């Protein structure tokens, strides 16, 4: 019934989002391995159930293929290629690793306590163009479908999933260029393994609010305080403000793509600023504001 609805009212390509683990179990090769490296949509070869189907294209046949592909008791021999269902591999970590529809579908299924897979389909308008938000709102009302955004899902997971792990052995004191002693801590992102750091002054656990800056690391510009870089200049101003206040924290987010946050999508900004907000929360039970210094 659902496959038939997608084919009739969705009109786009019907795909099956699955986890990396399940793709390995089924021994499904990527259609284009380069897509995985570039974090673009990871299509595998198309598939078909090896039993209980006829042509493979009917709604019933495609539903049977989906059921076979997600059934943990079924192995690679129960699936053949090519076929009429198109699997997509979701990155481990979901939308917090790649802000895509494939990952969003698997995340929602997991959050609902269901199998970590989902059938997805892009929606086309009657004239053959792709449906956008203004088209989707009346569409959702007509068919009684809820609407959600990847950005909202990212925000929900950041709020509810603990992504940051403190690395105690990296803890030590350093002096900044102002000769003030800041405590230096290193944190690991449990999703992608990247390390991030903090510089904090004072006991943050006893404060009602904490002066905070989330700063995308600017490399050598930050080291030499190159004020021609406006972000490094902002970092300097934040250090001065924390010094004057007597306490506060600077969260140093380490990621090569963060050199210019202005070029990131809203989804990526939510992800990285949300990550930055989780780190100071680990110092205290307080819920910190997401605004920057």
Give residue ranges: language-model regions.
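Catalytic domains of riboflavin
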Residues: 1-286, 291
């Amino acid at each position: 019934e659902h496959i038939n609805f997608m084919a009739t009212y969705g009109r786009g390509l019907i795909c099956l989002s699955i986890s990396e683990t399940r793709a390995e179990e089924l021994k499904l090769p990527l259609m284009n391995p380069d897509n995985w490296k570039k974090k673009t949509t990871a299509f595998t070869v198309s598939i078909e159930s090896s039993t209980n189907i006829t042509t493979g294209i009917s709604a019933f046949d495609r539903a049977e293929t989906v059921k076979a592909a997600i059934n943990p008791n079924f192995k690679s021999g129960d699936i053949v290629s090519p076929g009429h269902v198109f699997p997509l591999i979701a990155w481990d970590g979901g939308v917090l690793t790649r802000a895509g529809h494939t990952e969003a579908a698997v995340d929602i299924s997991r959050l609902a306590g269901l199998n970590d897979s989902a059938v997805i389909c892009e929606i086309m308008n009657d004239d053959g163009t792709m449906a956008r938000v203004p088209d989707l709102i009346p569409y959702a009302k007509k068919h009684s479908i809820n609407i959600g955004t990847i950005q909202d899902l990212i925000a929900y997971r950041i709020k509810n999933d603990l992504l940051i792990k403190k690395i105690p052995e990296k803890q030590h004191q350093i002096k900044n260029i102002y000769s003030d002693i800041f405590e230096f801590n290193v944190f690991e992102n449990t999703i992608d393994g990247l390390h991030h750091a903090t510089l904090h002054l004072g006991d943050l656990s006893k404060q009602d609010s904490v002066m905070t800056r989330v700063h995308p690391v600017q490399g050598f510009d930050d080291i030499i305080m190159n004020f021609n870089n406006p972000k490094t200049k902002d970092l300097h101003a934040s250090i001065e403000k924390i010094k004057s206040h007597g306490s506060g924290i600077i969260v140093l987010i380490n990621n090569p793509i963060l050199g210019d946050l202005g070029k990131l999508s809203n989804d990526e900004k939510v992800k990285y600023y949300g990550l930055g907000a989780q780190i100071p929360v680990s110092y205290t039970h307080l819920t910190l504001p997401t605004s920057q210094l």
